Amino acid sequence: IHNGHLHVISQLIEKKIIDRLILVPAGQPLLRGNAPIASGANRRAMCQLAISTLPTGISSHVEINPIEILRDGPSYAIDTVEAVRSSYPDDEIFLIMGADAYSKIDQWHRADELHTMVSIICINRPGFPAHGIDIAALDVSATAVRAGLSADVPEIVAAFMRENRLYDN
C-alpha cells in the first residue's frame, strides 16, 4: 500500500463518495503474473500501518479485511465481492480500482457477473485513458515501490519493509 492508495481513500471518504471502505490485501491475483513477494501477513500488517497514518476522521471509516490472503488458491474479485455482499446484504457495494486495472477488467474471471453485482469506481491515473472520477490521483506505481524505485509509502511502512527485507528495500 502506498501514498497513492492513501490519497484515494482519503479523497473518497472526505468527498463522501463512499461511507466506508473495506481494504482487501491482495491474495494471488492471476493477471499479475507472479506471486506476491510479501506474505499475506506482511501485506495485512503494511495495510494496518498505512491506515494508522491517516487522520482518525478517515481511518475510522476503513476496515481491513484479510479474506483474499486467507483463501487458498487464486483470488478472483468476483469471489471477494460475493463474500462482501453476504456480509453487507443491505449496502450498495462499490469496487474501487485505478484506470490501469480497469483497462483489463474484461479479462477478469466472470467479469460480466461482476459488473452486475457492484458499481465500479474507476480512479483516473496519469498515463491511462480517463474512464472514471478525477480526484487528482498521485502518480505512484506499486510496481516501482516493490522494485525499490519509489519512496512513496508512509515512513512507518517503509521501516516495516526494511525490517522484514521486503521488496529489496
Residue spans for each PLM region:
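Nucleotidyltransferase catalytic core that binds NTPs
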Residues: 1-169
